[in-house]
Design a protein with these regions (language model features):
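N-terminal, Lys/Arg-enriched amphipathic/low-complexity engagement segments
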Residues: 1-36, 86
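Short histidine-centered loop motifs in beta-beta connectors
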Residues: 33-42, 46
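Conserved hydrophobic positions within beta-strands
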Residues: 66-68
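Acidic low-complexity segments
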Residues: 70, 75-127, 132-136, 191
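Gly-rich Lys/Arg/Thr-decorated short loops/hinges at beta-loop-alpha junctions or inter-strand turns
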Residues: 121, 141-155, 282
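Histidine-anchored nucleotide/phosphate-binding helix
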Residues: 160-176
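Hydrophobic alpha-helical positions that pack around
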Residues: 179-297, 304-310
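Ferredoxin-type iron-sulfur electron-transfer modules in oxidoreductases and energy-metabolism complexes
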Residues: 339-354, 364, 368-404, 408-432
Length: 432
């Protein structure tokens, strides 16, 4: 698979403050945050505008200084509804005086700091970080710096530009969570990052930088655990639910997530900005750009020169080409976990006509989880709950490898997603 990492060598640009931002209360797995501001309120960078709605949730902060214009329902790009806070910016980017470095002395205070930061997995999943760090059975911290998806280079730039906060974040997690080992996994197509972090961690006890095979999806958590430690995450964990890295003594943090923690411990400023790779053959100036969370993607596109002259825009993808999703427009906000915006011309975006499945098994060979997409598709067509359970459809990580491998050009990954969604819905209803 082509890597297409053209922006990896370009320093990150900072976007001018937009006139408006729209900040959703749901940018994470778990309960949405509850708005704690009202229309007309003045906010600053780092002002709490949404309080976590439970343990598996995360605080939401204003990414700009300005005035709350509205609090209203918002349909997200995936079709889900949430509440969002719309803010008119004043351009000053005044930081809230409440943003002070936290005092961390033990695991409890570190977890409180992580929660106060509003930190979630910024590599894509959006799982609240304080929840995963709360486990007491961890002996290995895995830093996911694989960044295996084509086009995306945000983690690469984080390593080259913010290595100091990566190190301070790792140090804090290892010290206060009493984790003796840390492995930083980086795909071998980023030799500068490997060399830099190897030199910075050489004297750090228990820390290893590991060059990973350039194989998609190397960054998938179960693949990462096996490649870095040799341990195999079980299909089913002790709780009866799908196995987790914690079941084999591992906790995974994205490299930008751990860097964000390092920055928060130093400055007290929570997660309010996001680096986004803007790429594709239809964008005028491909680049990595740092933007306030809640910035509309159309404003990001404008900051990158807009659509290339003479090119007819065919598709907008939020995220990478494998795991991202096509969007009907650019009128959606940047979220904590967004890391890519791809614009393709009509020619590049054109999809071949699918043909009949020839049962070649390429999708089975390509699946990193060892699933059988061709068989699962038939089980889903038959709405066979027992068969889908037996074939572990809930283990699908939506990596897109099956679609990429299919010679018939069938939308296999989409079918897998529908099958998993139907299965999980039936499971919640007590399906057997």
């Amino acid at each position: 698979m082509p890597h297409v990492k053209a922006t990896a060598g370009q320093p990150t640009n900072k976007m001018p403050v937009p006139e408006h931002v729209v900040i959703p209360m749901s940018m994470h797995i778990g309960a949405p945050a509850e708005p704690v501001v009202k229309k007309g309120d003045t906010v600053m960078v780092g002002t709490v505008i949404g309080k976590a709605g439970g343990f598996v949730s995360a605080n939401i902060y204003s990414s700009v200084s300005g005035t709350v214009q509205d609090i209203a329902p918002l349909r997200m790009v995936n079709g889900a509804m949430t509440t969002a806070v719309a803010i008119k910016t004043d351009g000053a980017q005044t930081v809230d005086p409440a943003c002070v470095p936290p005092v961390v002395t033990d695991k409890a205070s570190l977890l409180a700091a992580v929660q106060a930061c509003g930190l979630v997995g910024v590599g894509g999943a959006g799982f609240p970080t304080h929840v995963k760090l709360a486990a007491n059975t961890i002996d290995t911290l895995l830093i996911n710096a694989a960044e295996c998806e084509p086009y995306l280079t945000t983690d690469c730039r984080e390593m080259l530009e913010c290595s100091d906060t990566i190190i301070s974040g790792i140090t804090a997690v290892m010290k206060y969570c009493e984790i003796p080992h840390c492995i930083i996994g980086i795909e071998r197509n980023k030799p500068e990052c490997i060399d830099l972090l190897t030199s910075l961690t050489r004297e750090m006890k228990g820390v290893e930088v590991k060059g990973l095979p350039m194989r998609y999806p190397q960054g998938a958590e179960k693949t990462l655990v096996e490649t870095c430690t040799g341990r195999e995450v079980p299909q089913v964990g002790p709780s009866g639910k799908p196995g987790l890295p914690a079941d084999v003594g591992c906790v995974i943090m994205n490299v930008t997530s751990v860097s964000t923690l390092g920055k928060f411990l130093k400055t007290g400023i929570p997660l309010v900005t996001k680096r986004v790779t803007v790429e594709g053959d239809a964008i005028a100036r491909p680049q990595n750009i740092e933007v306030p969370i809640g910035t509309l993607y159309r404003d990001v596109i404008d900051a990158c020169g807009g659509v290339k002259e003479g090119v007819e825009l065919g598709k907008i993808i939020f995220g990478g080409p494998m795991m991202g999703g096509a969007a009907p427009s650019a009128d959606f906000p940047v979220l904590k976990q967004n890391n890519g915006l791809l614009l393709f011309s009509k020619k590049a975006a054109a999809l071949p006509e699918p043909s009949a499945c020839i049962r070649c098994g390429h999708c089975i060979e390509a699946c990193p989880m060892g699933l059988e997409p061709v068989v699962i598709a038939q089980d889903f067509a038959n709405k066979d709950f027992a068969a889908l359970k037996a074939r572990c459809v809930d283990l699908c990580v939506a990596c897109g490898s099956c679609t990429y491998a299919c010679p018939a050009k069938r939308p296999v990954s989409q079918t897998m997603g529908l099958a998993k969604g139907w299965y999980m819905a039936e499971l919640r209803k007590g399906g057997k």
